[in-house]
Amino acid sequence: MQITFYGVRGSIPSPGPSTVKYGGNTCYVLVELKNDQRLILDAGTGLRSLGQKFIRDNTGINIILSHGHWDHIQGHPFFAPIHHPEQTNCRRKHRNRSRIRELRLFDN
């Protein structure tokens, strides 16, 4: 398993020379497993460039949005795979917070 933090900037994207070390994108994390499954946690601004890569590779993706704050969703409309039905599969939508605790990722 490999976990990569792509967006750690906070509520407002702020790319530029002063943010090069840690990046300027808002929240999103990529989890890659050995069986080629991928999970994206949240949908911050850096998601756009990752989406371009996944479109080229024709890679399937699972996305979990932790909550609806702007810094966690603002990259979502620009994530190209959501506009390609063959790469998108919406399985669950949880409205009950206690139910989310029961969700087991990558269970077969």
Spans of features found by a protein language model:
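Binuclear metal-dependent hydrolase catalytic cores
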Residues: 1-108
